[in-house]
Curated annotation (Swiss-Prot):
The record marks N102 as: Transition state stabilizer. UDP-alpha-D-glucuronate binds at residues 393, 398, 432-433, 460, 492, 526-535, 613. NCBIfam families: PRK06988.1 (NF005414), PRK08125.1 (NF005998), PRK11908.1 (NF008872). In the N-terminal section; belongs to the Fmt family. UDP-L-Ara4N formyltransferase subfamily. In the C-terminal section; belongs to the NAD(P)-dependent epimerase/dehydratase family. UDP-glucuronic acid decarboxylase subfamily. Pfam families: Epimerase, Formyl_trans_C, Formyl_trans_N. InterPro entries: Arna-like_SDR_e, Bifun_polymyxin_resist_ArnA, Epimerase_deHydtase, Formyl_trans_C, Formyl_transf_N, Formyl_transf_N_sf, Formyl_transferase-like_C_sf, Lipid_A_modif_metabolic_enz. It catalyses: UDP-alpha-D-glucuronate + NAD(+) = UDP-beta-L-threo-pentopyranos-4-ulose + CO2 + NADH; UDP-4-amino-4-deoxy-beta-L-arabinose + (6R)-10-formyltetrahydrofolate = UDP-4-deoxy-4-formamido-beta-L-arabinose + (6S)-5,6,7,8-tetrahydrofolate + H(+). It comes from Shigella flexneri serotype 5b (strain 8401). NAD(+) binds at D347, D368, I369. Residues 314-660 are annotated as: Dehydrogenase ArnADH. The gene is arnA. It comes from the Bacteria. This is Bifunctional polymyxin resistance protein ArnA. One of its GO terms (biological process) is lipopolysaccharide biosynthetic process. (6R)-10-formyltetrahydrofolate binds at H86, L87, I88, R114, V136, K137, R138, A139, D140.
Length: 660
């Protein structure tokens, strides 16, 4: 049976050996070039392929049409992936009549995503395993073909568990590959309600936070022990690595991070104490704990910290242009909840942010970005992270004021992008789900979906193409001039403070605010073209949490990434949104203050928006990049969002002249 294999690491090597032993004909192997910054303790797939006289390739992008065509020419009957680090596109899966299968290092559906070996140890699991599953477009989500369980012993560290998993994988493949070859397999669908997903880990993720329980810190040490980069902490500005540890149920009133004793080297934690058994100062040699204490100059009562002392004091400065807007004011609230951000904001109004104006770490100037260019340039230079959130983003304005949309959304933002390039500042840019346009994919994917818009004589697309061109400019600056960036695409975020009822009165608001105004005023809810268009509605709290994680950028995982932020489970038509909103309105305690419901009215889009409008039938995001980069998934049900949004707006209405 002819196969093409995607493989890396020890699992890749043993997978190839298992295929050959089972009588498969391997036409080609795709692997990766080794990362010079990574400690290579594992077998080389490239070397094995060369020894077995099998063609081997390591393209930067195996999903490029040229590589897809070359794989098609190999006519594989089945495809296998063994720890290949990049997602493989659906077009490649479809080349093999028998399908594609992936070996994953966990008991799926638990621990989908990256680094499951390390994550199960970080989380203190007592069992994991290996899974062979059918590959589908969503990573690690296909039907399970076979699994083997692996017990995790209390003294297991990453390398010992790795060896256990390799042994289990070898057994699993020996049992399963002949059955796949003969088409004799039983597949079991994964239980989505049990799925968990974890993202990529980097060395910077392994710092020891001493306020946590000693057992949690010990698990971190186990998860990244040699040959992984190791868990680390600081004495002042001196970094040291902890290679092995023990948990002590030491009852101490010492502050977390305090040295309780130096022989043994015992550190107070949020609960209990951690003994550092072996460790290493800087790039030095490994030594036992008491010698390490001497090397670091530690005495009883010394304090350790999770980051260098020189960097622990300075807050990250975040510049938010459009801070009074829907995203801007909610993001400000989230940032100020932490103690390590300084927020600088500019907007033409301050009604939504009035609650922050006296906060010591919030600095606001009222102004227009098209006028206050000097202030903006100075603050781009001064701040660490820039979020240009100013844009006209209401559909009726795209046809009513297309030139103004272009001038503000494109020209003004391009100037800010160039400031970020000039001063080498990180930019987090709000693209839009509108860039996908009339894409026909079931799930809109950041890396593979085509961006399809209508003809030039439909000005409705000026917002979409303005944003898309800015996305491409930012990407090019990142590639050519090293701009540090992340693009995020909100999918129909909604919640309190989304526009306002006055904006809705002139038609310049998003859908839910317009519908609430209709209920408040007793006017018919207008369903444009019947309201059958489907959207995926995302609670503002879910969206802001994802955006906050982009700003945090743990391990720089978000650099150069395009990330959809939406809730694919909250899909509803505009008509369904209206019906859910009406039901919530009818049972609201303030309902008796408002006129009777005036019904639904179907309106043609050309009458409502103008002749230059086109609509999109569906818009559902793939959120695999959000899973991978942010360890994020939305949690809030659409009905809860509707209830809270409605309640917020109803309580802003002056009820003195309403019927009771």
């Amino acid at each position: 049976m002819k196969t093409v294999v995607f493989a890396y690491h020890d699992m890749g090597c043993l997978g190839i050996e298992a295929l050959l032993a089972a009588g498969y004909e391997i036409s080609a192997i795709f692997t990766h070039t080794d990362n010079p910054g990574e400690k290579a303790f594992y077998g080389s797939v490239a070397h094995l392929a060369a020894e077995r006289d099998i063609p081997v390739y390591a393209p930067d992008n195996v999903n490029h049409p040229l590589w897809v065509e070359r794989i098609a020419q190999l006519s594989p009957e089945v495809i296998f992936s063994f720890y290949y680090r990049h997602l493989i596109c659906d077009e490649i899966f479809q080349l093999a009549p028998a399908g594609a299968f992936n070996l994953h290092g966990s008991l799926l559906p638990k621990y989908r995503g990256r680094a499951p070996l390390n994550w199960v140890l970080v989380n203190g699991e007592t069992e994991t395993g290996v899974t062979l599953h059918r590959m589908v477009k969503r990573a690690d989500a296909g039907a399970i073909v076979a699994q083997l369980r692996v017990a995790i012993a209390p003294d297991d560290i990453a390398i010992t568990l790795h060896h256990k998993l390799c042994h289990a994988a070898r057994q699993l493949l020996e049992q399963t590959l002949p059955a796949i070859k003969h088409g004799n397999i039983l597949e079991i669908a994964q239980r989505e309600n049990e799925a968990t997903c974890f993202g990529r880990r980097t060395p910077d993720d392994s710092f020891l936070e001493w306020h946590k329980p000693a057992s949690v810190l010990h698990n971190m040490v186990r998860a990244v022990a040699d040959p992984w980069p190791g868990a680390f902490s600081y004495v002042g500005n001196q970094k040291f690595t902890v290679w092995s540890s023990r948990v002590h149920p030491h009852a101490s009133k010492a502050q977390p991070g305090s040295v309780i004793s130096v022989a043994p080297l015992l550190i107070a934690c949020g609960d209990g104490a951690l003994e550092i058994v072996t460790g290493q100062a800087g790039d030095g040699i490994t030594m036992q704990g008491s010698q390490l204490a001497q090397m670091l100059g530690l005495v009883q009562g010394s304090r350790l910290n999770s980051q260098p002392a020189c960097t622990a004091r300075r807050r990250t400065r975040v510049l938010i242009l459009g801070v009074n807007g829907f995203i801007g004011n909610h993001l400000t609230e989230r940032l100020l909840r932490e103690d390590h951000y300084e927020v600088y904001g500019l907007d033409i109004g301050s009604d939504a942010i009035s609650r922050f104006l006296n906060h010591p770490h919030f600095h606001f100037v009222e102004g227009d970005i098209s006028i206050h260019s000097e202030w903006i340039e100075y603050h781009v230079k001064k701040c660490d992270v820039v979020l240009p959130l100013v844009a006209i983003a209401t559909p009726i304005e795209y046809t009513r004021n297309p030139l103004r949309v272009f001038e503000l959304d494109f020209e003004e933002n391009l100037r800010i992008i160039r400031y970020c390039v000039k001063y080498r500042k990180r930019i987090i840019f709000p693209s839009t789900s509108e860039v996908y346009g009339m894409c026909s994919d079931k799930y809109f994917d950041e890396d593979h979906s085509n961006l399809i818009v209508g003809p030039v004589n439909k000005p409705r697309w000026i917002y979409s193409v303005s944003k898309q061109l800015l996305d491409r400019v930012i990407w090019a600056y990142g590639e050519k001039e090293g701009l540090q960036f992340t693009l995020f695409l909100p999918f129909n975020w909604m919640g309190p403070r989304l526009d306002n009822l006055n904006a809705a009165r002139i038609g310049s608001s998003r859908a839910i605010t317009q519908l609430i105004l209709n209920l408040v005023e007793g006017s018919p809810i207008k369903l444009i073209d019947g309201g059958k268009q489907k959207r995926c509605f995302t609670d503002i709290r879910d969206g802001i949490e994802a955006l906050y994680r982009i700003i945090e950028n743990a391990g720089n995982r978000c650099d150069g990434e395009i990330i959809n932020i939406g809730n694919p489970e909250n899909e509803a038509s505009i008509e369904e949104l209206g019906e859910m909103l009406l039901a919530s309105f009818e049972k609201h305690p303030l309902r008796h203050h408002f006129p009777p419901f005036a019904g639904f009215r179907v309106v043609e889009s050309s009458c409502y928006y103008g002749k230059g409008y086109q609509d999109v039938e569906h818009r559902k995001p793939s959120i695999r990049n959000a899973h991978r980069c942010l360890d994020w998934e939305p949690k809030i049900d659409m009905q809860e969002t509707i209830d809270e949004t409605l309640d917020f707006f109803l309580r802003t209405v002056d009820l003195t002249d309403k019927p009771s």
